[in-house]
């Protein structure tokens, strides 16, 4: 599939990014409606099996769903699954970073248990086993079973990798969510494992049907490091206000965020600390583009890794553009998160509403790709 068939090119300069992602390519998936569908199917499952989810996830009816903006290269028939999995992570990760318990924290008890006991193949994401409420416990298990079914019946190898990343992130966050750090480098090394950059990468690789070997990861490790750093700091920059308000509400003095750390390190206010983080983000973004260019020139035959690094470029630009006005971080853009209005707004944003269902459009693109493979080299998205 040609990239132009499944995504549209955007200009970073059209968005108020404050200098972030300034020299980055930006695209948005044409099958964004499926990402919205996946998010709301996940939320409907939580309502049915656990309780009413009040937090916001990946939807952004103004700039675009996080899957559409950060993963424009994934296969159309995997967009909805990616939306479902990512929405679960959003609900789950908020429990990782707050002190919510009981009905407000859908996965809180299971996170604690997962830290103590690890995550097994039969309890792939650590959901449900610790909850004392039978309905909630069984509901979380239902969600977990559904996620594993969706992943493994689509791509078993990528599913296994994603499960491993989730498990590692769970343990890292619970053990270190309030720890102190002495240097930015020390914090970034932690944040790479904690902030979801590796999880987002795992969802992206699943969506692309791209499996990396251990050697692949070793070969690209130094190149991709500043990309992970930029992603972690971008998350901190845009989520700080939300986390700061939550910390004041709960009395939690410490939380893992680079802005909060610079406030302590430099004895400064939030605005000045955010400016330091913004400049660090821009520097890591610049470094990643330079290292990526050097890697491609030095490894002209490593086409799989070229594709991976290209996809990670969109992770950076997409996260910045999504974060600017996503309801998850920005109270002024909030609405009923369970209303399901995003696809209606999406149609209005694009100025048209196709009469074709997404499934029909996917079949048409697959047919074009099949014909292309019979007549010449296949186009790889």
Swiss-Prot record:
EC number in record: 4.2.3.-
Listed pathway(s): Mycotoxin biosynthesis
One GO MF term: lyase activity
Highest taxon listed in the record's lineage: Eukaryota
Family statement: Belongs to the terpene synthase family.
Known role: Terpene cyclase; part of the core atranone cluster (CAC) which products are predicted to catalyze most or all steps of mycotoxin atranone synthesis, starting from geranylgeranyl pyrophosphate (GGPP). The initial cyclization of GGPP to dolabellane is probably performed by the terpene cyclase ATR13. The Baeyer-Villiger oxidation near the end of the atranone synthesis, which converts atranones D and E to atranones F and G is predicted to be catalyzed by the monooxygenase ATR8. Of the CAC's other predicted gene products, the reducing PKS ATR6 might synthesize a polyketide chain.
Name the record gives this protein: Terpene cyclase ATR13
Source species: Stachybotrys chlorohalonatus (strain IBT 40285)
């Amino acid at each position: 599939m040609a990239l132009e068939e499944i995504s549209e090119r955007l200009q970073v300069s059209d968005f108020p990014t404050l200098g972030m992602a300034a020299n980055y390519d930006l695209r948005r998936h044409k099958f964004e409606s499926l990402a919205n569908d996946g998010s709301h199917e996940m939320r409907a499952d939580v309502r049915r099996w656990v309780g009413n989810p009040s937090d916001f996830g990946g939807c952004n009816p103004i700039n675009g769903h996080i899957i559409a903006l950060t993963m424009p290269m994934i296969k159309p028939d995997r967009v909805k699954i990616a939306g479902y999995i990512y929405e679960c992570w959003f609900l789950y990760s908020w429990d990782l970073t707050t002190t919510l318990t009981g009905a407000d924290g859908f996965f809180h008890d299971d996170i604690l248990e997962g830290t103590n006991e690890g995550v097994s193949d039969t309890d792939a994401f650590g959901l449900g086993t610790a909850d004392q409420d039978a309905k909630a416990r069984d509901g979380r298990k239902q969600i977990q079973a559904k996620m594993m079914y969706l992943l493994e019946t689509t791509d078993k190898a990528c599913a296994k990798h994603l499960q491993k990343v989730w498990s590692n992130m769970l343990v890292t966050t619970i053990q270190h969510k309030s720890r102190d750090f002495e240097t930015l480098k020390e914090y970034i090394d932690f944040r790479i494992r904690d902030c979801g950059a590796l999880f987002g990468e795992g969802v992206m690789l699943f969506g692309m049907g791209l499996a990396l070997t251990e050697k692949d990861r070793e070969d690209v490790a130094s190149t991709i490091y500043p990309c992970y750093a930029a992603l972690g700091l971008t998350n901190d920059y845009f989520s700080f206000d939300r986390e700061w308000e939550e910390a004041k509400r709960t009395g939690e003095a410490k939380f893992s965020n680079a802005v909060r750390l610079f406030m302590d390190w430099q004895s400064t206010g939030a605005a000045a600390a955010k400016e330091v983080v913004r400049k660090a983000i821009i520097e890591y973004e610049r470094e990643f583009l330079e290292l990526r260019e050097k890697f491609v020139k030095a490894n002209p035959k490593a086409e799989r890794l070229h594709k991976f690094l290209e996809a990670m470029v969109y992770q950076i630009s997409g996260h910045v553009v999504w974060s600017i006005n996503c309801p998850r971080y920005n109270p002024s853009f909030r609405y009923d998160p369970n209303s399901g209005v995003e696809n209606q707004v999406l149609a209005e944003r694009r100025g048209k509403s196709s009469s074709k269902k997404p499934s029909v459009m996917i079949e048409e693109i697959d047919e074009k790709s099949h014909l292309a493979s019979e007549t010449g080299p296949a186009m790889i998205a």
